Amino acid sequence: PRAVDRTQYALASGFAEILSTQLAIHELEVQKELTARAEVRALQAQINPHFLFNTLNTIASFTRTDPLRARELLREFSSFYRATLDNSGSLIPVSREVAQTKRYLTFEKARFGEDRVLATFDVSEDIEDTLVPAFVIQPIVENAVRHGMGDGDALRIDVSVHRDGEDAILIAVADNGVGMDEGTAARLFDERSARPDANSPQGGGAGVAMHNISERIHRFYGPHSYTRVESAPGKGTKVLLHLDLSESIFDIQE
């Protein structure tokens, strides 16, 4: 009987150890997701008053020259910030992130001129409902507008989102702007280069947002995911985001 008791005790102890390990792993995963959601909420809370002023000033100028256009912009502006606040989860469908990026461009086109900022979006239909972190495309497009626009030709921005193999997606944002040297491109996602910017919709600025994108992608999607910048002075810039969905810390349901 004692041998049986010892065997039962050993089995129970082993089971308890396994259960404790599983609970610890689960708790770690929960904490990772809570951290991810907190980071998104922090971005949402950073609504910059200067961007608010500049956009409302643009709308006000249209009230004198084109009241109908002013009304449309005001309605779109309301939708933009409502969507920003509504994206309370860490993950949103690709289609929603693209829609929010288009709203952002609406204000930049109104500010600089419809013929000065041109954009195309090429998104595979089969991944429109794929869940991605909020604020991964719009800040990159914002950075292209801020730093890519020159004094001559219109700025063209091409956004594409496609599958990259069976379990990954590739987000590409390319522009024909002024470009940047190798050192500047290497620092684009660097924490040390993240500086507040008064013209950014998110108060931390595009630099902070760009660094945040890189941090979240590597943290959420593992070592096989990456952020890459291809650029040269006078040759435009392309930003690539590779998201390995198979290594996501989230339980993604498509």
Where are the language model's segments positioned?
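Two-component histidine phosphotransfer core
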Residues: 1-47, 51-228, 238, 242
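C-terminal end segment of the histidine kinase catalytic
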Residues: 229-254
